[in-house]
Amino acid sequence: MIYQMQMPAKIELDESSHSDSFGKFIAQPLERGYGVTLGNLMRRVLLASLPGTAITGIKIENVYHEFSTIQGVREDVPEIVLNLKKVRFRSQCKRSCKTTVTLVGPMEFTAGVIQPQEGEFEVLNKDLHIATINAGTTVTLDIFIGRGRGYVPAEENRAEGMPLGFIPIDSIFTPIRNVKFTVENTRVGQRTDYEKMILEVETDGSITPDDSISLAGRVISDHVLLFADFSPAEEEYTEEEFKQQDDEFETMRRLLATKIEDLDLSVRSHNCLRLAEIDTLGELVSHKEDELLNYKNFGKKSLTELKEQLDKFDLKFGMDITRYQMK
């Protein structure tokens, strides 16, 4: 008789406590030991591997280091930096951007004053206090915003080519505020030694708890599949087969390197892809359909047009193009 491992049919959601920033998820039944294994794995990936947006540095006019004080501003620069670390963003933009804020006192500088120049991001905690500007004082502040994962110290945000007076900031990119899990016993038939794992996820509002666990699950799945598909045996090929494989490989690599601007697309689709920073066929097919629909102004009409283009090249969305990328 083959022993069948117990696994949850699906992940349950606690509707009573669910919100846009908090979710409680239940996985049961699990074999003994799997509650802690899965809980630890999900917690680590949620906290360290999900992308987010944060301030990476600032430049204040006539201020040249982070230990300065600013005439007519109640807070000193270190305190302003600490407050700026707490600003949370929602953004689909992959590239770094800069925005300039001019503060004319008397006023309270809150996070809501930080506005994008081209709609690259949205500030979530608009009421967050950053500084108090006294009457007769004007402060000009450049704010540098970037995308990343987890926590990045200020030194790693210090890049070449930054202007004189650039002050790097520790960046907390993770959109997850807190993750915790508990493991309880649960019954299956007459047996009570199975486990129930309860996972609680709190986000900063830039991503829903549902999307966060789904994204974390895909990250874990992509890594585990490397082991599931492992095969040490290598197939033997003739010299002619090797040459054919090389030719097909190079043909595909050249195809994936095709510029989007060379495709016969509508102006709307071109603009959508440009804003999403998708420049080549390879970058396009590496996206899934639902990911593209999340981009601003990207609708089903544009998606249908792109699918028709991909069909011409025998390509599809969601392809793994890792092996074709240049080392």
From Swiss-Prot:
It holds the Pfam family RNA_pol_A_bac. Residues 247-327 are annotated as: Alpha C-terminal domain (alpha-CTD). InterPro entries: DNA-dir_RNA_pol_insert (IPR011262), DNA-dir_RNA_pol_RpoA/D/Rpb3 (IPR011263), DNA-dir_RpoA (IPR011773), RBP11-like (IPR036603), RNAP_asu_C (IPR011260), RNApol_insert_sf (IPR036643). Residues 1-231 are annotated as: Alpha N-terminal domain (alpha-NTD). GO terms for biological process: DNA-templated transcription. GO terms for cellular component: cytoplasm; DNA-directed RNA polymerase complex. One of its GO terms (molecular function) is DNA binding. Gene3D superfamilies: 5' to 3' exonuclease, C-terminal subdomain, DNA-directed RNA polymerase, insert domain, RNA polymerase, RBP11-like subunit. It catalyses: RNA(n) + a ribonucleoside 5'-triphosphate = RNA(n+1) + diphosphate. The N-terminal domain is essential for RNAP assembly and basal transcription, whereas the C-terminal domain is involved in interaction with transcriptional regulators and with upstream promoter elements. Belongs to the RNA polymerase alpha chain family. DNA-dependent RNA polymerase catalyzes the transcription of DNA into RNA using the four ribonucleoside triphosphates as substrates. Homodimer. The RNAP catalytic core consists of 2 alpha, 1 beta, 1 beta' and 1 omega subunit. When a sigma factor is associated with the core the holoenzyme is formed, which can initiate transcription. This is DNA-directed RNA polymerase subunit alpha.
